[in-house]
């Protein structure tokens, strides 16, 4: 090798050459070893083309030891699978005919640094040894046996080991096909360009595990990874996929140290328990770490708390769960889709110490598998271990189950064989055996053929590689189940680009088929919105929608429209029920009772007055105004029915008209009466001439003028604000929307009601003032005193009405209280007028007709004299209340018959 290219090649490999020069004294020579014999710590099988093999025959050593205990399944089964595949290829006349494949198989001891040391054996043949200055004793040059050239390597198992070895092999352009390494880092074709694998990348596995987590409705899980490329890269891929897919949050991401200290696994379990809601644990760890995690969980008495989800490093292996079945129950594991190779089962079951001497570790396996010792000297005194007889048989005298990666080891060897076959077909057409173009085999060319292979594997599955050397993602999904005291891995689904999971076949500890929960927060109930925790989308607080809010979506509450309220579960809005004062309501009983009794009494009085219309007592009461007053009283009672009737345009219009009109008619008539009395007595003090407008016609005119003012105001109100009914949702808008009601009522505000009743109140107050002023008039001459008592009582009623009516404006029962208060007040006012002004007269008419006779007439002078003397008597002790003196003067006056031209104007008694 010369020129610039040669120097560049040597400079690139200078550090490795220095390493090899240091390592060379310990690298055993293969000179003189017979074919098929063990080669110290490696297996060597001669052939035309040699393939390297890397297998974890032993576990990682402790306390400074490179290697630990023997791994029967993961080490011996896989190693024998390569030997089985080589035998099949060498015996296949259609694959590499007349070309024998040899092997150099090394033990990695499950440690990347040890694997690096071992893999240097593969590149020895590529390092030219300079023997120019080395001379034999005879003075001649030394005879150097060149080691076999390894054209490709099968392995390694662990991803961290494969990464370490791949960095060496790529320098010497030696293709590598792994049967178990799944770390996503190895898909980087710029760094590991000579690396390929027949198992899918953990990127696919991570996606499959995310899909399983989502199918189980978990959204809050923790991850657990062995330190190294496999564990850390797998967890990183899982976290990345969970972010891309959304809906899965990582509670904790815990790393298992490469060299764990005592109590390390107990600390890991304690840390996982800090987020106790994250019961799902995603594990990317080697089987030793898996086992120690399960042991720590059992020591912490957490059997059944955690639900494990293991990667392909757990798969369907029995070693991690041996004697830990209860802790591992329910574990979901994933494994690249595979099938048991029956031919390998027959092959492996037939292996004995006699026919398998090429495997230098088989004797150690034999002792471990059958719990015996080959050498009698190895037997300890008092030990229960027996001596091996060599008559033991695998599968008969010991348990046997094919290891999960056996199929992939065979596929990896066949992939190398098919690539070499295609290469031989192209480079050596028609040649038997190797040709110069394949001696030596060019690694770069071989890599191209490896990437282009496409054949059916030993289990019938297609074996192909993508541009990064990865196999397509195809997985079987298992669950570790306990049934009737026996444990087994049961296939519950598969994943090929998308998930096929049979949840009904899953069994969980303590809950049967019910899916366990691994969630940060319980789902919010209907009517509750999520308030997510910052930085943790899967964790939230549930806040109920309050008041009149309803749940718009998972994160938003919105207030219902004004005329609506939320449904019971607050997921939507519904119309607020509309209520009104019903006829059968308790609030309507008293008003209706008073109204009915009042109307009956009023009609009774009217009928009585009509029947006895010409009797003296009816005439003396002033028939015209009496009937007007009775009409007003009747309207006051009738208003109750309008107030309780269902509000509509007609009802609301009638309410506006008659609510104040009945009172206006009543008080206008009473005011006219009291004003007439007052004017007569005031006029009599100054003159004997009669005041103006005291005739019945004038009195009616005055009364109707007063009433017309009320009607005029109502007409103006109708023009300014037409009458209509409304639904008031504010009156009964309670804090609890369940009790909210819309009140159907007439559109009459409190201010409008004050204006409506204000005029009637003005008439009432004015009438009361006149009643007070005429309180000194003798009772036998007028109705001033009954009117006064009527007005005093009415004022008391309305003074009680005002605080009750306006003091309940904020009550939820405002409609009922105010309507009842108003109608009762109006009815009581009418009842007071009816009772005090008419009932005594009706009583006399019906029960004392002897008193219903004409009385003598009195002149105005007599009336005035009586009034004057009455005022004088108020200064003495012999007086009646309100200054009414008992005078016989007016009682004994005899007035002659009325003449047409009489000097004094006379008035009928009681008509004044």
Curated annotation (Swiss-Prot):
Q: In which tissues is it expressed?
A: Is widely distributed in the CNS. Predominant expression is seen in the granule cells of the cerebellum.
Ranges annotated as spanning the membrane: 588-610, 625-645, 657-675, 700-720, 751-772, 786-808, 822-847
Membrane topology field: Multi-pass membrane protein
User: Which residues are noted in the entry as L-glutamate-binding?
Assistant: 159, 180-182, 230, 312, 405
Q: Name one GO molecular function term.
A: calmodulin binding
Q: Which family does it belong to?
A: Belongs to the G-protein coupled receptor 3 family.
Source organism:
Rattus norvegicus (Rat)
Q: Which processes are annotated in GO (biological process)?
A: adenylate cyclase-inhibiting G protein-coupled glutamate receptor signaling pathway; chemical synaptic transmission; G protein-coupled glutamate receptor signaling pathway; gamma-aminobutyric acid secretion; learning; negative regulation of apoptotic process; negative regulation of cell population proliferation; negative regulation of synaptic transmission
Identify the glycosylated residues: 98, 301, 454, 484, 569
Q: Which Pfam families match?
A: 7tm_3, ANF_receptor, NCD3G
Q: What does this protein do?
A: G-protein coupled receptor for glutamate. Ligand binding causes a conformation change that triggers signaling via guanine nucleotide-binding proteins (G proteins) and modulates the activity of down-stream effectors. Signaling inhibits adenylate cyclase activity.
Question: Mind telling me what this protein is named?
Answer: Metabotropic glutamate receptor 4
Instruction: Give the main location.
Output: membrane
How would you summarize the oligomeric state and partners of this protein?
A: Interacts with PICK1.
> Keywords for this entry?
Cell membrane, Disulfide bond, G-protein coupled receptor, Glycoprotein, Membrane, Receptor, Signal, Transducer, Transmembrane, Transmembrane helix
What InterPro entries does the annotation carry? ANF_lig-bd_rcpt (IPR001828), GPCR_3 (IPR000337), GPCR_3_9-Cys_dom (IPR011500), GPCR_3_9-Cys_sf (IPR038550), GPCR_3_C (IPR017978), GPCR_3_CS (IPR017979), GPCR_3_mGluR4 (IPR001786), GPCR_3_mtglu_rcpt (IPR000162)
State the disulfide connectivity.
67-109, 249-538, 372-388, 428-435, 520-539, 524-542, 545-557, 560-573
Q: Which residues lie on this side of the membrane: Extracellular?
A: 33-587, 646-656, 721-750, 809-821
Q: Which GO terms describe its cellular component?
A: cerebellar granule cell to Purkinje cell synapse; cytoplasmic vesicle; dendritic shaft; glutamatergic synapse; neuron projection; parallel fiber to Purkinje cell synapse; plasma membrane; presynaptic active zone membrane
Specify the signal sequence span. 1-32
The keyword Transmembrane belongs to this UniProt entry's keyword annotation:
yes
Q: Which residues lie on this side of the membrane: Cytoplasmic?
A: 611-624, 676-699, 773-785, 848-912
- Name its cellular compartments: Cell membrane
Say which domain of life the source belongs to: Eukaryota
């Amino acid at each position: 090798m010369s020129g610039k290219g040669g120097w560049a090649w040597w400079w690139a490999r200078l550090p490795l050459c220095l390493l090899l020069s240091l390592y060379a004294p310990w690298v055993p020579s293969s000179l003189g070893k017979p074919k098929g014999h063990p080669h110290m710590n490696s297996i060597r099988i001669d052939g035309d083309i040699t393939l390297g093999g890397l297998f974890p025959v032993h576990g990682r050593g402790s306390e400074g030891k490179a290697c630990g205990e023997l791994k029967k399944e993961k080490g011996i089964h896989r190693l024998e699978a390569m030997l089985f595949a080589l035998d099949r290829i060498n015996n296949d006349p259609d694959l590499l005919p007349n070309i024998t494949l040899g092997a150099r198989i090394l033990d990695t001891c499950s440690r990347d640094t040890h694997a690096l040391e071992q893999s240097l054996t593969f590149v020895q043949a590529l390092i030219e040894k300079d023997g120019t200055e080395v001379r034999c004793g005879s003075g001649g040059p030394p005879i150097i046996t060149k080691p076999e050239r390894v054209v490709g390597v099968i392995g390694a198992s662990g991803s961290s080991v494969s990464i370490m070895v791949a960095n060496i092999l790529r320098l010497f352009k030696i293709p590598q096909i792994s049967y178990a390494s799944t770390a996503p880092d190895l898909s980087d074709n710029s760094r590991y360009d000579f690396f390929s694998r027949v198992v899918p990348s953990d990127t696919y596995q991570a996606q499959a595990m995310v899909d399983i987590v989502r199918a189980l409705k978990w959204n809050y899980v923790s991850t657990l990874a062995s330190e190294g490329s496999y564990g850390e890269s797998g967890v990183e891929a899982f976290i990345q996929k969970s972010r891309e897919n959304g809906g899965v949050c990582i509670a904790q991401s815990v790393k298992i140290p490469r060299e764990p200290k005592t109590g390390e696994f107990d600390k890991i379990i304690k840390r996982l328990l800090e987020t106790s809601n994250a019961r799902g644990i995603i594990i990317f760890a080697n089987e030793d770490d898996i086992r120690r995690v399960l042991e720590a969980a059992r020591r912490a008495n957490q059997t059944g708390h955690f639900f494990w989800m293991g990667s392909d490093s757990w798969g369907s292996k029995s070693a991690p769960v041996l004697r830990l079945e209860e802790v591992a129950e329910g574990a979901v594991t994933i494994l690249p889709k595979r099938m048991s190779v029956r031919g390998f089962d027959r092959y492996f079951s037939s292996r004995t110490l006699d026919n398998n001497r090429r495997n230098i570790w088989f004797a150690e396996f034999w002792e471990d598998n059958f719990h015996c010792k080959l050498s009698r000297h190895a037997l300890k005194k008092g030990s229960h271990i027996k001596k091996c007889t060599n008559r033991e048989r695998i599968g008969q005298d010991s348990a046997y189950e094919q290891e999960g990666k056996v199929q992939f080891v065979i596929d990896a060897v066949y992939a190398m064989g098919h690539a070499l076959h295609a290469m031989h077909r192209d480079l050596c057409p028609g040649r038997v055996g190797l040709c110069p173009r394949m001696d030596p085999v060019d690694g770069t060319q071989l890599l191209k053929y490896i990437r282009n292979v496409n054949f059916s594997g030993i289990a019938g599955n297609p074996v192909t590689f993508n541009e990064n050397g990865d196999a397509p993602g195809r997985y079987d999904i298992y669950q570790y189940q306990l049934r009737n005291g026996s444990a087994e891995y049961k296939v519950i689904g598969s994943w090929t680009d998308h998930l096929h999971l049979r949840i009904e076949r899953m069994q969980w500890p303590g809950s049967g088929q019910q899916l366990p929960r691994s969630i940060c927060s319980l789902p919010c109930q209907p009517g509750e919105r999520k308030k997510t925790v910052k930085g943790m989308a899967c964790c939230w607080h549930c806040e109920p929608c309050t008041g009149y809010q309803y749940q718009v979506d998972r994160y938003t509450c919105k207030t219902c429209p004004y005329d609506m309220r939320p449904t019971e579960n607050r997921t939507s809005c519904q119309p607020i029920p509309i209520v009104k004062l019903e006829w059968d309501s308790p609030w309507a009983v008293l008003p209706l009772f008073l109204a009915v009794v009042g109307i009956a009494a009023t009609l009774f009085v009217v009928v009585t007055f009509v029947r006895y219309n010409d009797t003296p007592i009816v005439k003396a009461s002033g028939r015209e105004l009496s009937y007007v007053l009775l009409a007003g009283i009747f309207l006051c009672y009738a208003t109750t029915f309008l107030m309780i009737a269902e509000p509509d345009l007609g009802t609301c219009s009638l309410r506006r008209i008659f609510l104040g009109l009945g009172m206006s008619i009543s008080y206008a008539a009473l005011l006219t009466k009291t004003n007439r009395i007052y004017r007569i007595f005031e006029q009599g003090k100054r003159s004997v001439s009669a005041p103006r407008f005291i005739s019945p016609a004038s009195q009616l005119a005055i009364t109707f003028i007063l009433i017309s003012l009320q009607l005029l105001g109502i007409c103006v109100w109708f023009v300014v604000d037409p009458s209509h009914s409304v639904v008031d949702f504010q009156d009964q808008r309670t804090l609890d929307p369940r009790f909210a009601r819309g009140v159907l009522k007439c559109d009459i505000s409190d201010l409008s009601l004050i204006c409506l009743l204000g005029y009637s109140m003005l008439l009432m107050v004015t009438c009361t003032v006149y009643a007070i002023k005429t309180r000194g008039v003798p009772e036998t001459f007028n109705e001033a005193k009954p009117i006064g008592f009527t007005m005093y009582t009415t004022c008391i009623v309305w003074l009680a009405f005002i605080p009750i009516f306006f003091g309940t404006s904020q009550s939820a029962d405002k409609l009922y209280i105010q309507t009842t208060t108003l109608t009762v007040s109006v009815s009581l006012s009418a009842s007071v007028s009816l009772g005090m002004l008419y009932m005594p007269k009706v009583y006399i008419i019906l029960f004392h007709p002897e008193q219903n006779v004409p009385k003598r007439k009195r002149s105005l002078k007599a009336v005035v004299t009586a009034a004057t003397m009455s005022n004088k008597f108020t200064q003495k002790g012999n007086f009646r209340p309100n200054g009414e003196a008992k005078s016989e003067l007016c009682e004994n006056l005899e007035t002659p018959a009325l003449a047409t031209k009489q000097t004094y104007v006379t008035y009928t008694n009681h008509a004044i």
